Amino acid sequence: MKNFEPSDKVIKALRQVVANSYAVLGQTQICHWNVRGSSFFSLHSAFEAQYTELFPAIDEIAERIRALGAFAPGGLGNLAKMAGMKEIREDASAQDMVKHLSAANNALVADLVSARDAAGDAGD
């Protein structure tokens, strides 16, 4: 077993995951607040469940970044600059909210796969 040496690639990938996770969290919360229509109750609850589960996951990743000796990204402005996600319109339809969040979550999964691969390559 080789010794683990944190690489800039791992840290950069994890920092991107934090930024994009915060973007998904914020957009999910906006959808939670603004959803309307016949699916209101089910979507309102689903959006709340998602953003509630995202926060502790983001915290865990940020703490891993610190454990690797780097600083976790902070500040909403900085996170917004780092995030590579489109914003959701506040007045989006419920259907558009679901489509948007589905695409945002798929992009986040791709970031997570990249971070996993970088960590694996580094022996983490």
Predicted features and spans:
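Disorder-to-helix initiation segments
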Residues: 1-17, 94
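Helix-loop segments that flank and shape redox-cofactor active sites
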Residues: 2-9, 24-49, 111-124
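Short alpha-helix boundary/capping motifs
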Residues: 6, 49, 56, 75, ...
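Conserved acidic
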Residues: 13, 39, 46, 97, ...
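N-proximal short alpha-helices
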Residues: 16, 20-27, 34, 70-74, ...
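Alpha-helical transition-metal enzyme core signature, strongest for iron centers
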Residues: 17-28, 47-61, 65, 105-112
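Conserved alpha-helical segments that form or flank metal/cofactor-binding pockets of metalloenzymes
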Residues: 36-78
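Acidic/histidine-rich alpha-helical segments that form the ligand environment
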Residues: 63, 80-124
